[in-house]
Structure formats: structure tokens, C-alpha cells
Design a protein with these regions (language model features):
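Short metal-binding segments enriched for Cys and/or His
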Residues: 438-443
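Cys/His-coordinated zinc-binding microdomains
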Residues: 417-419, 433-436
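Residues immediately within or flanking Cys/His clusters that coordinate Zn2+
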Residues: 410, 426
Length: 443
């Protein structure tokens, strides 16, 4: 039985997140985008309000949120500012490898630290020449007894300049692809860790993005998140559980753009009436609303699958690329409704459009998601319909054409579908001219 009714706990969290977004994030969103800074005081407020670290399991003292709670929270925060919401959410991304890790002592040690004080943790996989291709990691982890020595550079790291801890993915052998990938929990203050300059971005400027360099950084065996051979799977499992939240970012951003466009269309007059009365505008609004709703349903389904212990990989990929592309389309159409004013910084649409563009890139590009989904559809998905060459003949032929042919063998051309009756197939198909070898006995 399907049930889309949120629980009282979930509704309470949704309301709390919405109130925080409208009161604390929305009034400062434009300012921090303009100055390209991340407000630590805002993050501390979110932490104090219980909107950060909610996904730490209850057995370690956390709230034990499921993914449904995470996507509800993310949508509301992103509606106010995608960039600042990214900064808040990325703590969950950085923490997910620790949640999924098999290293129990490490979990107990760092979860207690994160819950006790205001601590941030970032996710460090991407490199200057590597993004979605996690198996191509070049950051080297060399064995030093039972410990490891890290050398290399990470790039595009959200919260890289402000995080206290880092979930770092490296490899013991760059040529071994996914088999050499491993992961470690690294502290910012360890010797050899240095933070690069903040990367200037087109959008989501309220989120801190930097490079991180590791030079002979010694990582004790106690801080291994995943040993060599298990790091790649840990990264994939992390993405499967966090991609629904990227979809939720897109839903929140798209929802805001749509709401602003509706409000403007009801007030802007042209040719003697509000532009909301024009069918062209109404059709744009209808398509916006349709895409927001379908995106949210996909995001919720992916989150629900994860919460049920199912593998959400495919649904998460679908939700990620559908919702993020829909978001960009909605923001673009919203700007069109605003016309010239949408292109100015006096209204929020231009910022939402800049912010929305990033969703199609991070945590796996749209192209990578399509590759994942197409591979599943063509190689794993089990079709219900029979192959074309095995379709029942009587379903596709005029019954009158079957008269007098009872008992004869039916031969179907696998190229064009033509059916021939006789003891043997024809030497050549009269339609597509393929030879006898193209024919197969039909059921």
C-alpha cells in the first residue's frame, strides 16, 4: 500500500526547516552571494536548531533521520538559498562514509565529537583532473606499517576551507582503478594538510569550495574508513544515499523560481491585463508545476527505497538527473516571465538560475546518471513483453490473411517483421531484401 502522508515528526521537521529558511537564510542569501563568503554564524544557528547532523544513527547519540527527513529538510533550505543550503547539507555528505563504514571505534570517537561541539566534516573525492570517475583517483596512500601516508590534491571540496574533519578517498595504486581505492578520516590540523584558496564560482557562492593538499600526511590505522578494495564501493554507496538530496536541492530551487514567477505574472500588466491571463504564461506555469511535482515524487521514492533497506542507486540516479535538469528549465522559464527584470540583480531569479546550473554537475553529472540508468535498462531490467520476433502472429495480421494457411509453418523476418508461410523460409524477404538467414520460425 502506497502512502504519501508524512508522519507528525516529519511534518514538524519540515515546518521547522521552512521557518529557519525564511527567517535566517532568505534575508542574507543575496548578501553572501554578492561578497562570496560563507557565514559560519548561520551554520552555528542551524546546528543549534538541530538542523545539522540529524542523520547520525541513534545508537551513537544522534537523531537517526532517514533519507525522507533529509530530503524534506534540504528542499526547504534550498528554496531560500541553494548555496547556503549546500553548505549545511554537505556535512551530511561528508559524514555518510563514516555512517556506512565498518570501523565501529572510529564511529564512536568522531560521532561523539561532532555531537558535542560544532564540528564540520567535508567529503573529499574529486581532484583537479578527476570528478565523476572515482576509479581514476590519483591521491596516493602508501602503507607505513599499519598506517598510511597520504600525498596528493583534492579539488572542488565543498566546505573544504571550514571543515574540521575530512572523509578522504585515495588509492594505493592509481593503475589498479577501483580495486586500489581506500578511504580515511583526516583532521584538518594534522601535519601536512593545507587548504587552497577559495575557488571563485558562477553560482552557489555562499558555499565554501576549495582545494586540499596532502603532503606526507600520516593517517593512523584507527582512521581507516575503508581499506584498499572497499573504498570505491563506499563512495558509490555514499552517492546512492546522497543523490536524492541533490534532487531535493533542485526541487526547492525550482519551487522558489516557480513561486516568484507566479507572483510576478499576477502583478505585471501588459496589453491591458495581467500577463498571468495569457495562455503562453499559463502553459509555462503548468509545466513548471508539473516538473516540480514529478521531481519531488522521484526524490521521495529514492529516499524511501534507501530507508527501506533497498538499493536506491537507479531511482536516485533518475531523480538526480531529472530533477536537476527540470530545475534549470524552470529557472530559465521563470526568468523569461520576468523578462528584462529577471536579468537584473534586483530580483532573485538570476541568482537562482546561476545556482541551479551547478546541480547538473556535482555528485555525478547528468551524463553519468544517464549512463548508469541506460546500463540498467538495457542489461539488468527484466522486460515483460516478449522479443519482437516472438510476438504472436495473430496479433499483427489481418485474420483474412490467415485463411487457408492453417498448419503451415510461419517464418518471421527479424529485420522488418514480414511473416512468410511455408515449409521453408523464402530465399529473400520481399520487403527488406534480406536473405533467408534473416528468417526465424514464429510461435
Amino acid at each position: 500500500m502506497l502512502d504519501f502522508q508524512l508522519s507528525p515528526r516529519q511534518l514538524k521537521l519540515q515546518k521547522k526547516a521552512r521557518e529557519f529558511a525564511l527567517k535566517e537564510i532568505l534575508p542574507v542569501a543575496w548578501y553572501y552571494d554578492e561578497i562570496d563568503e560563507t557565514p559560519l554564524n548561520l551554520l552555528k544557528k542551524a546546528h543549534a536548531a538541530g538542523l545539522i547532523n540529524g542523520d547520525i544513527p541513534k545508537k551513537y547519540g544522534g537523531k537517526g533521520w532517514g533519507l525522507i527527513e533529509s530530503v524534506l529538510l534540504t528542499e526547504e533550505l534550498a528554496a531560500a538559498c541553494p548555496g547556503l543550503a549546500t553548505t549545511i547539507f554537505d556535512n551530511s555528505l561528508g559524514m555518510e562514509p563514516l555512517v556506512l563504514s565498518k570501523n565501529e571505534p572510529l564511529k564512536k570517537k568522531y560521532f561523539s565529537k561532532i555531537l558535542k561541539d560544532f564540528k564540520l566534516i567535508c567529503f573529499a573525492t574529486s581532484e583537479p583532473t578527476m570528478g565523476s570517475d572515482v576509479a581514476a583517483i590519483r591521491c596516493k596512500a602508501e602503507r607505513d606499517g599499519n598506517d598510511y601516508i597520504l600525498n596528493g590534491t583534492k579539488y572542488w571540496i565543498t566546505n573544504g576551507g571550514i571543515a574540521d574533519y575530512m572523509s578522504v578517498f585515495a588509492t594505493v595504486d592509481p593503475d589498479s582503478q577501483h580495486e586500489g581505492v581506500c578511504a580515511f578520516l583526516v583532521e584538518k590540523d594534522w601535519k601536512g594538510v593545507s587548504i587552497g584558496r577559495k575557488i571563485p564560482k558562477m553560482g552557489q557562492r555562499g558555499s565554501n569550495t576549495t582545494g586540499i593538499n596532502f603532503k606526507d600526511v600520516k593517517v593512523p590505522k584507527e582512521n581507516i574508513l575503508a581499506p584498499p578494495g572497499e573504498g570505491f564501493m563506499l563512495a558509490m554507496q555514499t552517492f546512492s544515499r546522497t543523490r536524492p538530496a541533490i534532487g531535493a536541492f533542485a526541487v526547492g530551487t525550482a519551487r522558489s523560481a516557480m513561486e516568484y514567477a507566479i507572483d510576478y505574472a499576477k502583478k505585471r500588466r501588459a496589453f491591458g491585463t495581467e500577463i498571468a491571463n495569457f495562455q503562453a504564461i499559463q502553459h509555462k506555469i503548468a509545466e513548471m508545476y508539473q516538473k516540480v511535482e514529478t521531481s519531488r515524487l522521484l526524490v521521495w521514492k529514492a529516499a524511501w527505497e534507501a530507508d527501506q533497506g533497498m538499493d536506491p542507486t537507479i531511482t536516485a540516479s533518475i531523480a538526480k538527473f531529472y530533477s536537476t535538469e527540470a530545475c534549470l528549465e524552470i529557472a530559465n522559464e521563470a526568468l523569461q516571465i520576468f523578462a528584462g527584470y529577471g536579468y537584473t540583480k534586483m530580483f532573485p531569479i538570476e541568482k537562482l538560475l546561476r545556482d541551479a546550473r551547478l546541480f547538473r554537475i556535482y555528485e555525478g553529472t547528468s551524463e553519468v546518471q544517464r549512463y548508469i540508468v541506460s546500463g540498467y535498462a538495457m542489461n539488468v531490467y527484466q522486460p515483460v513483453m516478449p522479443p519482437l520476433e516472438d510476438l504472436p502472429i495473430h496479433r499483427e495480421m489481418d485474420p483474412t490473411e490467415l485463411e487457408g494457411k492453417e498448419g503451415q509453418t510461419a517464418w518471421r523476418c527479424r529485420i522488418c517483421g514480414y511473416v512468410h508461410y511455408g515449409e521453408t523460409p523464402p530465399e529473400e524477404c520481399p520487403y527488406c531484401f534480406f536473405p533467408e538467414s534473416a528468417f526465424k520460425e514464429a510461435p
